[in-house]
Amino acid sequence: MLKEFREFALKGNVVDMAVGIIIGGAFGALVNSLVNDLLMPPLGLLLKGVDFSNLFVVLKEGTPPGPYIALADAKTAGAVTLNYGLFVNALIGFLIMAFAVFLLVRSINRLRSLSEKSAAPAVAPQTKECPFCFSIIPLKAVRCPNCTSQL
């Protein structure tokens, strides 16, 4: 049983999948940092200092009643909130990630199509044109079936 597991684990697909998951996790962290640290602060500045992570709606107030300035204050008070600012951050992160994956898949498909075109052997023509009546005839024909000319 241990031998079978070792063969399964060392197959190329399993190892490739593990590497993909690890790189995907690191790429996800990179995209999250890009969104939270580089894109959202300038966007918040353009929108007059709005911090998207603190955009929320109080559904039910906590023990000290609101208004709550920050999401952390509302959470500390035990308020039930709808955190749409965090959703906006996650949505922007998802769109960036989806676009990056789209570009990656598009590049891989182009490379595949280029390698398939170069690997495909040149197909020899199977037909030719009769020089007398200009109809298409088999390449090995010695007489045209249309005009009966000797080729």
UniProtKB/Swiss-Prot annotation:
This is Large-conductance mechanosensitive channel. HAMAP family: MscL. NCBIfam families: mscL, PRK00567.1-4. Channel that opens in response to stretch forces in the membrane lipid bilayer. May participate in the regulation of osmotic pressure changes within the cell. GO terms for molecular function: mechanosensitive monoatomic ion channel activity. The keyword Calcium does not apply. The chain crosses the membrane at residues 14-34, 85-105. It comes from the Bacteria. It is a multi-pass membrane protein. The gene is mscL. Belongs to the MscL family. Pfam families: MscL. One of its GO terms (cellular component) is plasma membrane. Keywords: Cell inner membrane, Cell membrane, Ion channel, Ion transport, Membrane, Transmembrane, Transmembrane helix, Transport. It is found in: Cell inner membrane. Homopentamer. Gene3D superfamilies: Large-conductance mechanosensitive channel, MscL, domain 1 (1.10.1200.120).
